[in-house]
């Protein structure tokens, strides 16, 4: 089982994924991605879904037109783990392919 990150580890790990923030009231991280249009947003979600499935770690997300809101947490661990940070980093890399920093 993956271990939950302690507060200090969590804060340090978040420095490596700019744009992600801790969610108030729960142990999770979140980011909002804004793309040029719906096609790019959906393309991002498709690519991110393939990475998530490969790693057996799935996001909570919501898409409205060109915006994708993502929340990551590891339910089995009861909070944020390295898996969340790694998926956040992978999503950032995918977003950069669409010109979103």
From Swiss-Prot:
One protein family per Pfam: Pterin_4a
Family annotation (CDD domains): PCD_DCoH_subfamily_b (cd00914)
Biological processes per GO annotation: tetrahydrobiopterin biosynthetic process
EC id: 4.2.1.96
Superkingdom classification of source: Bacteria
Keyword field: Lyase
Reactions that this protein is recorded to catalyse: (4aS,6R)-4a-hydroxy-L-erythro-5,6,7,8-tetrahydrobiopterin = (6R)-L-erythro-6,7-dihydrobiopterin + H2O
Enzyme class, spelled out: lyase
Signal peptide: none
GO molecular function, one term: 4-alpha-hydroxytetrahydrobiopterin dehydratase activity
HAMAP family per UniProt: Pterin_4_alpha
Family, similarity comment: Belongs to the pterin-4-alpha-carbinolamine dehydratase family.
Protein name: Putative pterin-4-alpha-carbinolamine dehydratase
Organism name: Rhodopseudomonas palustris (strain BisB5)
């Amino acid at each position: 089982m993956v271990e939950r990150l302690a507060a200090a580890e969590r804060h340090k790990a978040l420095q490596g994924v700019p744009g992600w923030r801790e969610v108030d009231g729960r142990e999770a991280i979140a980011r909002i991605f804004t793309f040029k249009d719906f096609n790019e947003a959906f393309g991002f979600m498709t690519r991110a879904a393939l990475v998530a499935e490969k790693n057996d770690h799935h996001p909570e997300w919501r898409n409205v037109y060109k915006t994708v809101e993502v929340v990551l947490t590891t339910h089995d661990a009861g909070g944020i783990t390295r898996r969340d940070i790694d998926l956040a980093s992978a999503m950032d890399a995918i977003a950069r392919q669409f010109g979103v920093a």
